[in-house]
């Protein structure tokens, strides 16, 4: 006699592989899937999960943000390798780049050049796997997910100060009722 289960043919909601067809990403997934299985390290499981994520969920992080987070006295991150599953971008507002050790999925050309010029090192995630197979002496960071322009529009409602989708940015558009006291009310 069989058991009648309510949940028939229900797919798991989380990703089990990246949606991207990028062969280099697939090789990294293969590597970190092996490491996550064979080592008892939560670091490798976290890296693997982030490799599955969509591009919008792998936001970029700037070298100025990395420098600010690693230079904190309380964090005690001296000599540790910063790991980012995403892109490391340059920030021209940062005048002097400190000596950094960064491992990431990809780097912008100028970010890579500035880190290397400062005497730091730039690693790929497969090079990191050889150096720290269990993630020892590393710190995992990620960029701000809600920094995208699209997030200005999400969650619309009263008193939320969300940006409306407008057909034009001119004086006559979305500037009247609800935006000025003289036109009924101001939110």
Curated annotation (Swiss-Prot):
Annotated positions of the Phosphoserine modification:
136
Which keywords does UniProt give here?
A: Cytoplasm, Phosphoprotein, Ribonucleoprotein, Ribosomal protein
Question: What subcellular locations does the record give?
Answer: Cytoplasm
An example Gene Ontology biological process = cytoplasmic translation
Residues annotated with Phosphothreonine modification: 134
Q: In the record, what terms sit under GO molecular function? A: RNA binding; structural constituent of ribosome
Q: Does the keyword Cytoplasm feature in the UniProt annotation?
A: yes
TM ranges are none
One GO cellular component term of this record is: cytosolic large ribosomal subunit
SUPFAM superfamilies in the record, alphabetically?
Answer: Ribosomal proteins L15p and L18e (SSF52080)
Q: Which family does it belong to?
A: Belongs to the eukaryotic ribosomal protein eL18 family.
Additional note from the record: There are 2 genes for eL18 in S.pombe.
The task this protein performs is described as: Component of the ribosome, a large ribonucleoprotein complex responsible for the synthesis of proteins in the cell. The small ribosomal subunit (SSU) binds messenger RNAs (mRNAs) and translates the encoded message by selecting cognate aminoacyl-transfer RNA (tRNA) molecules. The large subunit (LSU) contains the ribosomal catalytic site termed the peptidyl transferase center (PTC), which catalyzes the formation of peptide bonds, thereby polymerizing the amino acids delivered by tRNAs into a polypeptide chain.
Q: State whether it acts alone or in a complex, and with which partners, per the record.
A: Component of the large ribosomal subunit (LSU). Mature yeast ribosomes consist of a small (40S) and a large (60S) subunit. The 40S small subunit contains 1 molecule of ribosomal RNA (18S rRNA) and at least 33 different proteins. The large 60S subunit contains 3 rRNA molecules (25S, 5.8S and 5S rRNA) and at least 46 different proteins. eL18 interacts with NAP1.
The identity of this protein, by name, is Large ribosomal subunit protein eL18B
Q: Organism, per UniProt?
A: Schizosaccharomyces pombe (strain 972 / ATCC 24843)
Lineage, opening ranks: Eukaryota, Fungi, Dikarya, Ascomycota, Taphrinomycotina
The UniProt gene name for this protein comes to rpl1802
